[in-house]
Amino acid sequence: MGKVAVIGAGLAGSEAAFKIATSGFKVDLYEMRPVKTTPAHRTEGFAELVCSNSLGGKDITTGSGLLKEEMRLLGSLIVSVAEEFSVPAGGALAVDRVKFSRRITEILENHPNIKVIRKEVTQLPEGYNFIIIATGPLTSEAFSKVIQRLTGSEYLYFYDAIAPTVDADTVDFSKGFWGDRYGKGKGDYFNCVLNEEEYEIFYNELINGKQVPLKDFEKAVFFEGCLPIEEMARRGKQTLLFGPMKPVGLIDPKTGKQPFAVIQLRKENREGTLLSLVGFQTKLKYPEQKRIFRLIPALKDATFVRLGSIHRNTFIQSHRVLKPTLQLKKDPRILFAGQITGVEGYAASAATGILAGINVVRMLKGKEPTVPPETTMLGGLVRYITEPKEELQPMNPNFSLLPDLDKKVRDKRRRKLLKAERALKDMEIFASQWKN
């Protein structure tokens, strides 16, 4: 019988430990609280929801809603307890966070196959066949050093500096052009063009936009990390024209001239269905981001699948160090799960914990690890964080991660519904087969 350690009893660690234990294997679950706590946690309970009490939308035509349905098919502990302690929240699955965490703690502490060890892990525990690292965005300083040694220090990030991402289908490509600076590269960037008057309007709204206040434990990040676009703009009206909005080296084929200002959109995935605003990390409030960035002519009707942010977040560059099975490339006995892998949101974190647990169970049985089909939201997410790219920025579940349907469907909601039905059908097959 193999020995397994799960480090961290957040959403991902709780799911991983539960999956392994309910599959008949022993697991040691390490949690440093209350011996050592974090600036964001308030209790010693497992799966404590430190920000919102909402696990996102329930509708399967939302990324989060579809992912939770897939998790249900995989026997999710988090989803079942969330439903047990749900509170009215319109179309979202919100919970009584105290009862939710307490119940998960009870289930895991009382499971005969789970041994809970309350201590800070400062080095990789020895004597285990498999180790799942699920230490979350507020990983302790001591264990961060362990992760740095495992992954290479340059592949561990201590903050998110996230720029908004738009659905490529909603960009007006007539308001700009594809091309790289000085004609180098393969034309992977779409350049949204602004004239002087449009820039003036955009600039004034940007510097006056309402910002999200920084939490105490995030203060250092602001200075160490990338400067928010609005802070850069406040240094002077010309600053952006020599920074993220510089037009140098770009010629608009329509005019044969260099534009006054550009905002570059870069492909976020191979299919080019997701485009991110290059250098536009921001602390603007979400409604302000939509309002202000839609002043860019090409983005007038854009759908934002992810909005920008800058906050404290320990995460690895999974695309360089992990396989899609969530195993460490250089040591496949070690798996990562949760927000530390570069997924974003409660549901996505928990879902990767389920997958890590599934793969440990398979390997304990002498089988090869597995990945859900790319047509599923979980399959799309793990492929996104592990497929080759320049740099990984955390991603939430959204429909742009899923491959196109065989037939073109014009109606957006219908298209999402058909993708969701396909995903659930494929996940049902995966759920019935992963144990075999």
From Swiss-Prot:
Is the keyword Methyltransferase in the record? yes
User: What EC number(s) has UniProt assigned to this enzyme?
Assistant: 2.1.1.74
Q: Which Gene3D superfamilies match?
A: FAD/NAD(P)-binding domain
GO molecular function terms listed in the Swiss-Prot or TrEMBL record:
flavin adenine dinucleotide binding; tRNA (uracil(54)-C5)-methyltransferase activity, 5,10-methylenetetrahydrofolate-dependent
Q: Which cofactor does it need?
A: FAD
Q: Keyword Flavoprotein on this protein? A: yes
Provide one Gene Ontology biological process annotation: tRNA methylation
Pfam families hit by this protein: GIDA
Q: Which GO terms describe its cellular component?
A: cytosol
Main localization (coarse): cytoplasm
- Reactions this protein catalyses: uridine(54) in tRNA + (6R)-5,10-methylene-5,6,7,8-tetrahydrofolate + NADH + H(+) = 5-methyluridine(54) in tRNA + (6S)-5,6,7,8-tetrahydrofolate + NAD(+); uridine(54) in tRNA + (6R)-5,10-methylene-5,6,7,8-tetrahydrofolate + NADPH + H(+) = 5-methyluridine(54) in tRNA + (6S)-5,6,7,8-tetrahydrofolate + NADP(+)
User: Which UniProt keywords are present, listed alphabetically?
Assistant: Cytoplasm, FAD, Flavoprotein, Methyltransferase, NAD, NADP, Transferase, tRNA processing
Q: Any idea where this protein resides?
A: Cytoplasm
InterPro entries the UniProt entry points to: FAD/NAD-bd_sf (IPR036188), MnmG-rel (IPR002218), MnmG-rel_CS (IPR020595), MnmG_N (IPR040131), TrmFO (IPR004417)
What family classification does the UniProt entry report for this protein? Answer: Belongs to the MnmG family. TrmFO subfamily.
The name under which this protein is listed is Methylenetetrahydrofolate--tRNA-(uracil-5-)-methyltransferase TrmFO
Q: Which organism is it from?
A: Persephonella marina (strain DSM 14350 / EX-H1)
Task: Provide the organism lineage as a comma list.
Answer: Bacteria, Pseudomonadati, Aquificota, Aquificia, Aquificales
